Amino acid sequence: MSKNTESLISQLLDAAGAAGADGADAGMSRSEGTSVTVRLGKVESSERSEDIGAALRVFVGKRNASVSTSQLDSDSIAELAERAVAMARVAPEDPYVRLATAKEVAGTLPEIDLYDDAVPAVEHLTETATAVEAAALSNDGITNSEGGSASHGEAHMMIATSNGFSANYKRSSQGFSAVVIAEKDGAMERDYDYSVAVYGADLDAPEDVGNSAAKRTLSRLGPQKPPTGQFPVIYDQRVSGSIVGTLASAINGAAIARGTSFLKDSMGEQVTSAGLTFIDDPLRPRGMASRLFDGEGLPVARRAMVEDGVLKSWFLDIASATKLGLTPNGQAARGMGSAPSPGSSNFYLENGDLSLEALIAEIDEGFLVTEMMGSSVDMITGDYSRGAGGFWISGGKVSHPVSEATIAGNLKDMFKAITRANDIDMRKSTAAPSLRIDGMTVAGS
């Protein structure tokens, strides 16, 4: 983090004090990125972006307010602080929100490998975007392309508080993708594939990703609506992270404190199939959501949220922990446009032993989901319904593509009916292997 950025965040805190705040904390992000898009072998766009943003939270007695800005000249900083304090003075009292104390904040920060200093040139990004699209277009049956793209970005993150805490880190990311189209009997289908990682060396080969995008697209031709009834459903690892994400929402401390989660009374109880362990790991080297401290400056640690199917912990920030009578556990997330709130980092379900093919082979009639559309999830009751596409399974084998399907169930039952495969992609921030869930309602024809 540059001296200029450190100076800016100090100015924010000083301005808050001058405006009458009893305390304040601030977060700042400075990011830059480059992206290239190629379509049918020609460069369509090449863009460079630079952004800076800051969020300020002020405390006046038991009242608080949060504001954000991208205007960081001296006058704008002073005006922002004055506005925040004015907002706090008329806000309702909240006895649960406070600054982290000196004893709570992170001391010596962990060393995590989050930054790749090998920055790709624009020419390299162009070559990658061209290669991934060309590989996809080389497949027979692919008739058009929506483009190949490649990008690189890095961000510098900093948090500081008026009681002396200040820390920062930087992270990088790279990725590329291809989206292509196939046509059969006048009907078109499209699909994509991508690769993204913190380090360029961890990316898949562009040719492999392009060929995968083509294969996925071609396999979707001639879809049918599925039958309606109760069937086992397999979530391909491409979409299985959505199930992990719903669990994260259900054990979010803010929802528990409000009483708006169907798992609010389930601490210490079995909430998933036995043998399943869900980990939140902010310290994963090269993790897409790794962090050295949480959004309020607290130290972070790898934590089993669900162990052997039993719920062990909530995602907590200071406010939700205080309201629940618990100790904050360093799981506050912070965006530049919002106050800290509980949130996951690298959250995943540990791998199983079975292959995806083995999961499929055990099913007489069922649905392999590879695409999700829309969402209707009631976190109070656990009722779940989503649009889906993928493939019908018949006699233990993939039979034909499926579209215009709806899958439904209740998350309480779904979590306890999970059988996992062994194909997790740990580069994702929310990840799981392919998952089989029995007894789902499938609606189609």
Regions found by a protein language model. Name each.
Residues 1-291, 295-298, 307-310, 395-397, ...:
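Active-site bordering "gate/hinge" segments
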Residues 266-445:
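Dual-mode signal for accessory low-complexity, basic/Gly-rich regions
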